[in-house]
């Protein structure tokens, strides 16, 4: 009679961990356990409760009973980029390739929050690089944009961080990033200019030194 092999819980747990890590190799990977940290979520929930009282609301009324926890969970999601490593994400999909012309991913949706008022800003990012023996999986470029956007930001720094991450990992002949965004801190408050759009750029290598390369990039994103 054939005996069935039994697998210890430890082995099963190790296999589960390996499977999870393998999935992280394919997708964005971050410390999920940190998201489930009840102590952090609890302190954030208490803080939102105090804010509601501070603006003159009653956190105990029916419509607001679950609001503190909902807001805390939303903020954890909107700032998940702090718990992700964009350069490690890029390194998981780097390939040797002789292609040496511009690679452009444009019209990447971005949603972030300004660090001054914690109000949203949103728009489009356009990212290009010129390979020097290495390319990266195309989906990783929007993912890197997402990682940096899901933090408290200023648009200027966000633009530079995207450029620097790609430059550091691929060491290409050049990187170009342009972001066009609407800032709710300018729309809902302050100057209240509903149609104002902020454009920032960060470039390196050939995009800095070659006018024709820079012009090609701007033409391709429709900004010339």
UniProtKB/Swiss-Prot annotation:
Keyword hit for Zinc: yes
Ranges where the record places region Disordered: 1-20
Listed Pfam families: GTP_cyclohydroI (PF01227)
Gene Ontology terms for molecular function: GTP binding; GTP cyclohydrolase I activity; zinc ion binding
Domain of life, per lineage: Bacteria
Positions bound to Zn(2+): 114, 117, 185
EC number: 3.5.4.16
Keyword Metal-binding: yes
Group of enzyme by EC: hydrolase
PROSITE patterns xref list: GTP_CYCLOHYDROL_1_1 (PS00859), GTP_CYCLOHYDROL_1_2 (PS00860)
Pathway annotation from the record: Cofactor biosynthesis; 7,8-dihydroneopterin triphosphate biosynthesis; 7,8-dihydroneopterin triphosphate from GTP: step 1/1
Catalysed transformations (reactions): GTP + H2O = 7,8-dihydroneopterin 3'-triphosphate + formate + H(+)
Any single Gene Ontology cellular-component annotation: cytoplasm
InterPro entries: GTP-CH-I_C/QueF, GTP-CH-I_N, GTP_CycHdrlase_I, GTP_CycHdrlase_I_CS, GTP_CycHdrlase_I_dom
Record keywords: GTP-binding, Hydrolase, Metal-binding, Nucleotide-binding, One-carbon metabolism, Zinc
Similarity comment: Belongs to the GTP cyclohydrolase I family.
Subunit structure as annotated in this protein's UniProt entry: Toroid-shaped homodecamer, composed of two pentamers of five dimers.
Name used for this protein in its record: GTP cyclohydrolase 1
Species assigned in the record: Chlorobaculum tepidum (strain ATCC 49652 / DSM 12025 / NBRC 103806 / TLS)
Gene behind this protein: folE
